[in-house]
Amino acid sequence: MFKERPDGYGLRLGDWRTGLLWTLAGCAGMGLILWFAARHPTMASFYEQRAPDGAGRIILLNAIEMWGWEFMWRGLLLFGLARALGPGPAIWLQAVPFAFMHLGKPQVETFTTIFGGAAFGYIAWQTGSFVYPFLIHWFILSFTMLLATGRIG
């Protein structure tokens, strides 16, 4: 890994047109769902307790956290596993530990992450980049926190 180029692990723009379409569709679709889901008492309570002070800090700190998450799951794990096993198994295998990392979060979120992780894996594989899952995931987390804390909506 250390002698390989970072773009082999999705650290590149890849197919940016497809990535942009997935990002816009993913953010719009999840924005609509989260408009209601993030206000559920369980979600609101969970994220309100964990949100940093101020909208700017929420957005910045979530960007840093999600960059690391997406590089780990969709960068290293997905592209690394795909070399050995092919893209189909790699997409599902990288989604499993991703889902386990959501244990302890609100139940509805935990149950949906296996499919969300697989969707992020598919987008990363299709575009050749983990940047687009990062943008969607960053939006999801930040939008959820901003809604849950009453900073928007």
Label the model's feature ranges.
Residues 2-71, 83:
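Juxtamembrane helix-loop-helix connectors linking adjacent transmembrane helices
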Residues 26-31, 87-102, 138:
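Small-polar-interrupted transmembrane alpha-helices in polytopic inner-membrane proteins
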Residues 15-20, 51-55, 84-92, 106-107, ...:
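Membrane-helix interface segments
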Residues 74-85, 146-149:
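Membrane-interfacial alpha-helical segments at the cytosolic side of multi-pass membrane proteins
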Residues 55-60, 68, 72, 111-119, ...:
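Membrane-embedded alpha-helical segments of multi-pass membrane proteins
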Residues 4, 100-108:
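Membrane-interface helix caps and helix-loop-helix hairpins in membrane proteins
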Residues 51-55, 68-78, 94-102:
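Short juxtamembrane and helix-loop transition motifs at transmembrane-helix boundaries
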Residues 88, 92-95, 109-153:
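Functionally important transmembrane alpha-helices
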